[in-house]
């Protein structure tokens, strides 16, 4: 045998596992046989996630590393990196657009160095859905709200949409669903995910990454889909593997059956609280058991959607009969449905074949104990049972007596619900939730109840199909009568695009200093996210959102207080409006049909005819505040970094979210971004949101730490931390607005550090939460812990994440912001480093910290200055 053949024989031969899939003309890779060849009897004990990861290794991994990679899965180890090759990238128009702006900028950088810009192309199927740019400027009680909101969206976003249109033809493998068609996760669930792919004659499990933390929505179908930042998405787009280590895979056994009248929203809010307490951060969860089997795909999707809210990476369900029925319901081709069932049963991905799966950790959750819930204020895992509203001090008898007169006179009370929004793919992709809301509206209309006049109501389904089945059931007019007309098919209020309030209502809130709130069927309620004048927000099921529009205040015991009286003077309670499960199921069963999905999606996914290929370089518009050539290959960002002599830009507490780091909501005229837009001659009416300007770094960097709800512990008054987008410039000790501090430090070329508490970077997967601090000159973030996506984004931008050892934090170190910081040691994956802190009096502290570059690939990315710098070097080397 030749030396070459001998060397090849030492490795697993991938092709021996390539077989014909019975009953088809397709082939597949038999991961079971590959695993059994290494460790007989192991495959049947593997969790669902491990089986899917094993398949893609057998199909894609380098033969030299295949056996070692499979052993990581078999032996449940996490000490070696292995490659993951997602089949698709799905994007919304904020992070997806900024990713494509980066690629367009990369083309420019390569052209400037004499390279071929046309070589920069996504090689993995990339699907961009425009869903984040519509604001609810016209509420659901305006019969023309949809058309008016869409017209405003087109006008405000002309620059952005021009760039996105260019991308369709300038880049290969990029498809675009334009504005006005729905939410990316719901379209992914209802149409885009095939569950099982078939390409070039090979069948394999669908997998994807998405530029939104709620990408796990389609985990409900058994598809590994995880949220990533735009930078990691760019890596996958360009055909690079996403290097990973075997995650913690946790089984969540769902037992019991839900009680009558309990919605999937109630369940997911309870599960979110439960799992947050169980500390499942960065884990892949697999829901199984009798309770899981009984849940519809709509219910499962509601649970999977909120994966980031309970801190996990994925929230998987097995493929089973519910999956097959859903694929049929949503109009998938019969051949595709048959392929899913055949492949799953052949490869051990069918639910029955996972009874023998073993988990190192199993949690148990009883669905029968779930009651009606809200979540809030401020955090989605802060569950609030509706029966405890009085006990928790939300509804107050003393308040009712004090304000009875003004409330009866239809004056806006303290605690007013100023926004009630049926919104978000979390709930509108679940027909049972939408129908339940419509049935509550119908009964309210029959009894003569109306929304309170200060409540801005809206209904923004994530799919056009919702309109069809509501019209079929005669229920859309019932929602419209209460002010819940369709305002758009987009994320809207859920991602902070709630639009302007009635000026008179806004002024009254200001003049009377009212505590006003929002109630929405979304997935996040962080302070300041929904609207600047909604001081807090509560998450609720769609039918509860309708009920709160009738109540008009959060100071209301929704279970016990009367919502009004009927014609006979009899009090009307929530129980009088709430539909039975049988009523809901009857409407869903009769009126949600495959033909509706086909009617919407066949036309939506028809290929564009006659597309003309454009020039490889984008013609940047110099006056644009939406799209600008990025700076990441220029000046200081392309040079050496300094980890010595750093000053703190901010010292922060626990649970800092990406909304704190780079908010998404409306831009106020008094903000740094607002002042810049005014200088650029943009009218205040067209400021739009922070999110929509993330393709222009000059606007977006002014959003860094711009959240007015921020508490920077360096800024105190009489010993109390002052709330606001504030900083203290050192060594002068001058308190100033955050942006002015950043500008000062940038002019001084002062390297910066941010010190934080636990769970730093929660929330949305926005890469600008990392880009903003990098452009500000931040070299290091040291925290007690990081949320997964944000930590990855920091690495991708060349910012070094460091973690305090247990028992050490900003408080034990008695930091006040006057210190200087240096980092010493060899920067390697997971290595111990020294953070040397020099106090103002010269005292030095040597603080051990852990380097949170978690893989060798991340070390390489950081060493290159970030993923964008590494891309440029790789393309030029080619």
Regions from the PLM with identified roles:
Residues 2-152, 295-301, 305, 309-333, ...:
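N-terminal amphipathic, basic-rich helices that act as targeting or association modules
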Residues 49, 180, 196-344, 350, ...:
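Mobile "lid/hinge" segments at catalytic clefts and subdomain interfaces of large enzymes
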Residues 85, 103-159, 289-399, 559-619, ...:
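Terminal amphipathic helices with adjacent charged low-complexity linkers/tails
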Residues 284, 288-295, 523, 743-787:
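Extracellular/luminal Protease-associated
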